[in-house]
UniProtKB/Swiss-Prot annotation:
CDD domains for this protein: RRM1_MYEF2, RRM2_MYEF2, RRM3_MYEF2
Domain RRM: start-end pairs: 100-178, 233-310, 523-599
Record SUPFAM superfamilies: RNA-binding domain, RBD (SSF54928)
Gene Ontology CC annotation, any one: nucleus
Phosphothreonine: modified positions: T13
Native organism: Homo sapiens
Disordered: region residues: 1-101
InterPro entries recorded: MYEF2_RRM1 (IPR034630), MYEF2_RRM3 (IPR034631), Nucleotide-bd_a/b_plait_sf (IPR012677), RBD_domain_sf (IPR035979), RRM_dom (IPR000504), RRT5_SRSF_SR (IPR050374)
Residue location of crosslink Glycyl lysine isopeptide (Lys-Gly) (interchain with G-Cter in SUMO2): K53
Localization per Swiss-Prot or TrEMBL: Nucleus
SMART domains named among the record's database cross-references: RRM
This protein's name: Myelin expression factor 2
Taxonomic placement: Eukaryota, Metazoa, Chordata, Craniata, Vertebrata
Biased composition (Basic and acidic residues): 27-42, 54-72, 83-96
A Gene Ontology molecular function term of the record: RNA binding
Length: 600
């Protein structure tokens, strides 16, 4: 749910509602002071006030009394709310429209609600409420609502402040008595209405069509900001012919969407500088304009079209405290470790090989021409026939597999292997669920028997003859779905989702051996020169535009980022696309290097 900046009663930061604070003492029936009193107290208020004037000493006392009641846990039933407010209505009654409210958009992202309040109070009149909408990450959406004391101020705001230039951005102001304009704005950006009073509006990232997500003409950072609802609607156009005026600029770019304003940058003599800005009704129209017109010729000059700097939030990935972890002094950079994706191998990971017994160097070897029947599945795995699985230290013998895999192996392998970081996310339960009732029964209770006859018959439909499987298991345990492609129609698709290993499973010599032995299909990329405060969640979000991300990881050392990471996709095509369109882009001012991870 999107939070919002808001006008708060001084000292009410510890109130009950985390989203909205009353613009007056809760429960007071009216906010209008006597004109003489308001006139007397006007000079006492500065721009540092919290957006609400205290009308008189009595109201201040009542406010303190109400705050005291809050601290003891009692709550007022009639709390002020900008979208369902009626001064004279009681709790539980239906609220009417508020005709004193306006919706403001195209606000600079760095603008605070206090500045908006002071501006409106100076240019228009007394302000009783200000709220700037934010996205799920607490960043400004560039729009909000302002409520005035009287309805006449709304008309004045529309006359004097609409198209008012604020830090280079023309404000768009509309009447919004029912909150409809605010509701539409939040729906367009994929947010939810402040206060939770408008249900079923959805949240999270904005769903974009593939024509945008896969468009090579649109920078990835523009797409990610559009998805997150943080993108403005103004574009910057350069290399214009000097005879192009704002009317021609508007005429051309109206093909891409509804143009609200077009401007040509001029020098001190009033002559065109060959550049300008175009503001659209919606951010997605601005993105479409980039796709349609960047590089196109206007009067024999190719236009350079991009998002205006004020439409893109800056320092997207800066940490809240502004501190960026650095490499040790004197160290110019770091190379790749010996683990997968360049991750260093720790001493604890070196012991993983012992847990898996003979499974390590051979890497699910299948040394023979194939499986050759289920009772010969061991071979290079180290099973030694299923009765010889004692060699796998973590299992402790086939006789215990009925206990270990109770419920058709629904337990995760984290417990079975004895390590939290070598687990299978969902166990083998879902994976083998469709392989036949005998398979389930065998693994649930009778797999400890010395022969696999009943099990073999039960899985004949799913695994049948595996003689065609030679040369290992495809991509290794972290993507066993690809390995089972040729094992029969019943298992490939099932294992794709179920036997996806957790982070760190194949790090260490066992993983290195298996990956080296059985190879990779190129689903994973390695990313260098990442900001040190970038999290794996941000990394995943950044690369999600290239395809479905199965796994993302930031390489860490002593709890600090090493400035590199890996991203694994569901297909080699997505990985190649990521290398193609993401290599060289900047994240927090750092140009990242993206390439296929050959160590995966």
């Amino acid at each position: 749910m999107a939070d919002a900046n808001k006008a708060e009663v001084p000292g009410a930061t510890g109130g009950d509602s985390p989203h909205l604070q009353p613009a007056e003492p809760p429960g007071e029936p009216r906010r209008e002071p006597h004109p003489a009193e308001a006139e007397k107290q006007q000079p006492q208020h500065s721009s540092s006030s919290n957006g609400v004037k205290m009308e008189n000493d009595e109201s201040a006392k009542e406010e303190k009394s109400d705050l005291k009641e809050k601290s003891t846990g009692s709550k007022k039933a009639n709390r002020f709310h900008p979208y369902s407010k009626d001064k004279n209505s009681g709790a539980g009654e239906k609220k009417g429209p508020n005709r004193n409210r306006v919706f403001i958009s195209n606000i600079p992202y760095d603008m605070k609600w206090q500045a908006i309040k002071d501006l409106m109070r100076e240019k228009v009149g007394e302000v009783t409420y200000v709220e700037l909408f934010k996205d799920a990450e607490g960043k400004s959406r560039g729009c909000g609502v302002v409520e005035f004391k009287d309805e006449e101020f709304v008309k004045k705001a529309l006359e004097t402040m609409n198209k008012y230039d604020l830090s280079g951005r023309p404000l768009n102001i509309k009447e919004d008595p029912d909150g409809e304009n605010a509701r539409r704005a939040l729906q367009r950006t994929g947010g939810s209405f402040p206060g939770g009073h408008v249900p079923d509006m959805g949240s999270g990232l904005m769903n974009l069509p593939p024509s945008i997500l896969n468009n090579p003409n649109i920078p990835p950072e523009v797409i990610s900001n559009l998805q997150a609802g943080r993108l403005g609607s103004t574009i910057f156009v350069a290399n214009l012919d000097f005879k192009v005026g704002w009317k021609k600029l508007k005429e051309v770019f109206s093909i891409a969407g509804t143009v609200k304003r077009a401007d040509i940058k001029e020098d001190k003599d009033g002559k065109s500088r060959g550049m300008g800005t175009v503001t659209f009704e919606q951010a997605i129209e601005a993105v479409q304009a980039i796709s349609m017109f960047n590089g196109q010729f206007l009067f024999d000059r190719p236009m350079h079209v991009k998002m205006d700097d004020k439409s893109v939030p800056h320092e997207e990935y800066r940490s809240h405290d502004g501190k960026t972890p650095q490499l040790p002094r004197g160290l110019g950079g770091i190379g790749m470790g010996l683990g997968p994706g360049g991750q260093p191998i720790s001493a604890s990971q070196l012991n993983i090989g012992g847990v898996m017994g003979n499974l390590g160097p051979g890497g699910m070897g299948m040394d023979g021409p194939g499986f050759g029947g289920m009772n010969r599945i061991g071979g290079g795995i180290g099973f030694g026939g299923l009765e010889a699985m004692n060699s796998m230290g973590g299992f402790g013998g086939v006789g215990r597999m009925g206990e270990l895999y109770r419920g058709a192996m629904t337990s995760s392998m984290e417990r079975d292997f004895g390590r939290g970081d070598i687990g299978i996310n969902q166990g083998f339960g879902d994976s083998f669920g469709r392989l036949g009732s005998a398979m389930i029964g065998g693994f649930a209770g009778r797999i400890g028997s010395s022969n696999m006859g009943p099990v073999g018959s039960g899985i004949s439909g799913g695994m049948g003859s595996m003689n065609s499987v030679t040369g290992g298991m495809g991509m290794g345990l972290d993507r066993m779905s690809s390995s089972f492609d040729r094992m029969g129609p019943g298992i490939g698709a099932i294992l794709e989702r179920s036997i996806d290993m957790d982070r760190g499973f194949l790090s260490g010599p066992m993983g290195s051996g298996m990956r080296e032995r059985i190879g990779s299909k190129g689903n994973q990329i390695f990313v260098r020169n990442l900001p040190f405060d970038l999290t794996w969640q941000k990394l995943k979000e950044k690369f999600s535009q290239c395809g479905h991300v199965m796994f993302a990881e930031i390489k860490m050392e002593n709890g600090k980022s090493k400035g590199c990471g890996t991203v694994r996709f569901d297909s080699p095509e997505s990985a190649e696309k990521a290398c193609r369109i993401m290599n060289g882009i900047k994240i927090s001012g750092r140009e990242i290097d993206v390439r296929l991870d050959r160590n995966a």
